[in-house]
């Protein structure tokens, strides 16, 4: 993984991992790049280029949550909390 840029993390609601949410990866201009569902344990993962990204998390019954991330080569871990 040292030569790749990975953005990964866990989506939480009420301090518990949230399955079935969707996390979108937006580039520095806000352009949609990719989308993945969270796993049964709330986890998500993207392979991306180094740079500034926005994670947009969509979960049933919650407002979308945007989280800015600066990713470098290697693994960038991000926790996202939805209402």
Where are these regions (language model features)?
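A short, amphipathic beta-strand motif
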Residues: 5-13, 42, 80
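Residue-level detector of high-confidence beta-strand sites
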Residues: 20, 35-37, 47
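Short, acidic Ser/Thr/Gly-rich low-complexity loop/linker segments typical of extracellular
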Residues: 28-43
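A glycine-anchored, Pro-Gly-centered beta-turn/N-cap motif
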Residues: 49-52, 74
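A short, solvent-exposed beta-strand micro-motif common in secreted/extracellular proteins
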Residues: 51-61
């Amino acid at each position: 993984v040292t030569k790749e840029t990975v953005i990964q993390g866990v989506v939480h609601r009420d301090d518990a991992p949230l399955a079935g949410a969707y996390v979108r990866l937006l580039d520095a201009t806000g352009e949609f790049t990719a989308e993945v569902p969270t796993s049964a344990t709330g986890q998500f993962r993207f392979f991306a280029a180094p740079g500034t990204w926005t994670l947009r998390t969509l979960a049933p019954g919650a407002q979308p949550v945007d989280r800015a991330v600066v990713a470098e080569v290697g693994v960038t871990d991000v926790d996202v909390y939805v209402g």
